[in-house]
Amino acid sequence: MGVDFKLTIDSEAFKNHTGPKVNYSDSKIAADEFYIQNHNLLFEHDIKNQSIDCFTVNNNKAFFKTVTSDFAFDILAASFYLISRYEEYLPHEKDMYGRYDCERSLAYREGFLNLPLINIWVKDFAEKLKEKYPIFNTQYSIFKFEPTYDIDIAYAYKYKGLLRNIGGFLKSPSSERIKVLTGAVQDPFDCYAWLNQLHQQYNLQPIYFFLVAAKNGQYDKNILPHKDAMWNLIKQHAKKYRVGLHPSWQSGDDKSLLKKEKEQLVAMIQAAQSVPTQIAESVSTPGRQHYIRFNLPEGYQRLNKAGITDDYSMGYGSINGFRASVASTFYWYDLEKEEQTTLHVHPFCFMDANSFYEQRQNPEQTLQELLHYLLVCKEVNATLITIWHNNFLGTASEFNGWKELYEKFIAQVQQ
């Protein structure tokens, strides 16, 4: 809410304070306080199944209902449960990619996955405080749009070498491949100049996440990082925009690869920006897991150890929505170790692949979905983070209409 505050466990000091004051405990202390009756969650040290019964407050879901409070539920415990991803630490089945299954989440089951519920709660809470203390003022952050891109496969045909192109042609004969390789037409995944023009036109500051696996595999199929084409592509973007690491699928199986891939990317950024290695290594490095493949707490513990400072993986790789029920950056709290870390988590709510492959939406349906996320984020002055892949925004016939819908959406963001 953008306000300064002081924490105290001194009940007499609390009573004597003459300004706005919030009592978070199991009993009231002062007549002029704003009282929130606490749930036990924040005072527990073990991780266990919680009894959660949702109800409706101001047309939105809530839980950890209170009886004698000035607020209808324990907003602190409920927010912590969602933002810490408490439920992901409990025993659960995983999906086909080894990830937490979104359908097991409270947000999915209770129908609020499409809302930044914590941001909404905070706004309601601030209004309640204002009712009790008219002098209480909040300073909300401003709405922010942050476009991000995952470069899993930089080019469809170019720079893949003779053997890969022959193999690809034998599997799927295509005149387009021949035209691209002879320079007659542009590679269908090459949308970089168009994106650059779009960013300049609307004054956007995107982040590009590059997959730089040292070798290809079933799920890692990018141009190899030692090739000039990949170096040049990353260098071009690092000179203009923020560049992050897209840790490979292989790095999820071989724990030693994450650090190596980060070092590879840092070397490329260093070459682009002409800065000493020690400075390049100290610059904050954002990351987003390939296929959104990570589990808590191990996945984030590995990022911390590898020196990844900002993670952009907090969302689902199977459905759009707010995985942590929030649209604001937060520090990751390691529930297993019970400590706040320095890892910044930047939650996203939309990924093109979810709309296309999982939700089976067409461009018009996807535009409406995006406009919904734009609206709900603007209403609470939150940050809207989207994920797009370059193959969706080029000229591949499979994705006809998706480039145009993205441009329409960007225009709507700026209105």
Positions of predicted regions on the chain:
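Terminal accessory/targeting
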Residues: 1-225, 328, 335, 339-415
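Glycine-centered flexibility motif
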Residues: 2, 111, 240-244, 319-323, ...
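Conserved hydrophobic/aromatic pocket- or pore-lining residues that grip, position, or stack substrates
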Residues: 150, 246, 303
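Metal-dependent polysaccharide deacetylase catalytic core of the NodB/CE4 family, i.e.
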Residues: 153-157, 193, 200-294, 390
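Acidic, His- and aromatic-enriched active-site or binding-groove loops in soluble protein domains
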Residues: 167-176, 226-246, 307-315
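Residues within well-ordered alpha-helices
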Residues: 195, 230-233, 299, 373
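Active-site proximal loops enriched in glycine and acidic residues that flank catalytic Cys/His/Asp
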Residues: 210, 247, 288-291, 307-316, ...
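Catalytic domains of cell-wall/extracellular-matrix polysaccharide-remodeling enzymes
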Residues: 251-339, 397-398
